[in-house]
């Protein structure tokens, strides 16, 4: 990251040794780092994000990077390779929701979901084998976290369930993921602290 104020949003190691990815929300850039044989990282290769404010992301097992765009209200997908190649597949697919900050891909790689902190909602995308994205619901609302909802993060388990950390209502909402990507509410864990900021499922 060459910029002095990149405001990095997320960092993650890509599957299959494809390298390290960092989103810069302050510069609308995405950085990729390849691994050297000794485990250190090559210099960053910087790429322009398809939309403004790239934020949360996830990477499928086949190397498809899907990134939320918090200001644009959208998500984009990109192709990654072990040699550091980076190309846009689907650019800025809008969901008409506000502040889609965090994103997760299902374990089978078929769907991606964004947590829309400013709209009390979750948006779902179909993720095709070629990495292209298609919005599941025309209005962008695959699920709602209810009045005062503020989903800050999302996670999925290996049994086709999605969990949303709702800081507005201080709960963790659980949803079953249908065969076509629909989300059906199945649980709500109450009494969570106001300071909660992240969630993981396993």
Regions found by a protein language model. Give the residues of each.
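A short beta-strand motif characteristic of beta-propeller blades
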Residues: 1, 42-48, 88-94, 134-145, ...
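Beta-rich, blade/repeat-based domains predominating
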Residues: 1-19, 49-65, 94-110, 142-161, ...
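Short loop/turn segments immediately following the C-termini of beta-strands
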Residues: 16, 25-26, 35, 70-71, ...
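Residue position within the beta-strands of beta-propeller blades
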Residues: 21-22, 67-68, 114, 164
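Structural signal for beta-propeller blades
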Residues: 28-30, 73-75, 120-122, 170-172
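Short loop/turn segments immediately following beta-strands, especially the blade-tip
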Residues: 33-40, 77-86, 124-134, 175-182
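Blade-level signature of beta-propeller repeat domains, shared across WD40, Kelch, NHL, RCC1
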Residues: 167-202
């Amino acid at each position: 990251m060459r910029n002095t104020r990149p405001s990095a949003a997320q960092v993650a190691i890509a599957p299959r040794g494809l390298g390290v990815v960092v989103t810069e929300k302050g510069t609308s850039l995405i950085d990729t780092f390849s691994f050297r044989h000794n485990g250190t990282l090559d210099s960053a290769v910087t790429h322009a994000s398809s939309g403004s404010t790239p934020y949360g992301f996830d990477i499928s097992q086949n190397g498809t990077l899907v990134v939320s765009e918090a200001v644009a209200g959208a998500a984009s997908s990109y192709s990654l390779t072990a040699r550091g190649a980076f190309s846009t597949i689907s650019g800025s697919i809008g969901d008409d929701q506000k502040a889609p900050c965090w994103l997760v891909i299902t374990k089978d790689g078929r769907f991606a979901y964004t947590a829309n902190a400013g709209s009390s909602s979750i948006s779902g995308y179909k993720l095709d084998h070629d990495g292209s994205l298609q919005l599941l619901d025309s209005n962008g609302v695959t699920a709602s976290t209810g009045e005062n909802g503020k989903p800050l993060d999302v996670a999925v388990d290996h049994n086709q369930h999605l969990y949303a950390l709702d800081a507005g209502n201080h709960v963790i909402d659980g949803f079953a993921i249908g065969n076509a990507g629909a989300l059906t509410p199945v649980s709500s864990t109450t009494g969570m602290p106001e300071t909660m900021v992240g969630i993981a499922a396993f």
